[in-house]
Amino acid sequence: LPISDMMRRAGMPIKTVSITSQKEVKGAHGITIIADMLYEPQNIVDIDWLILPGGLPGTTHLGEFKLLRQLLKSHASVKGNIAAICAAPSVLGDLGLLNGKNATCYPGFESHLAGGTYTAKAVEVSDNIITGKGPGMAIAFTLAIIVKSLGKDKADRKSVV
């Protein structure tokens, strides 16, 4: 929720997407979110960022969703921006998208950062990939996305945080 809120406050157009057959998605701790849209390949166009939320079992579902895996690989192949927080950087590692990059993740998922270098930092920016350690780092994670997209001045605005 803070990621979507802060990005919208910064003026970044975002769409939350459900990979299930329903817009209503329940998170790891029982928080229900209504996604803006369902994942339909024809609607996934003009992407600036692919952002993966963490948590379980959500991260597992993201990693198992074939169309998302294909989209992540395709987006990465053209140096598209990708961000993942908490357990979700493991999806990037499993796809080989962290090769040669620094990354961080929720404690216990370090072994899934294949090809990457685990740094234990709160947030890691490595080329086109941003990773965040966990839910407590959501604000810093989102600010890194905003800085990379719009510059530091935009991220420093009081209305963003």
Segments predicted by a language model, with ranges:
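Active-site-adjacent pocket-lining segments in enzyme domains
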Residues: 5-19, 35-161
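A cross-family phosphate/adenosyl-ligand binding-site feature
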Residues: 26-36
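Short active-site-proximal "capping" loops at secondary-structure junctions
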Residues: 19-25
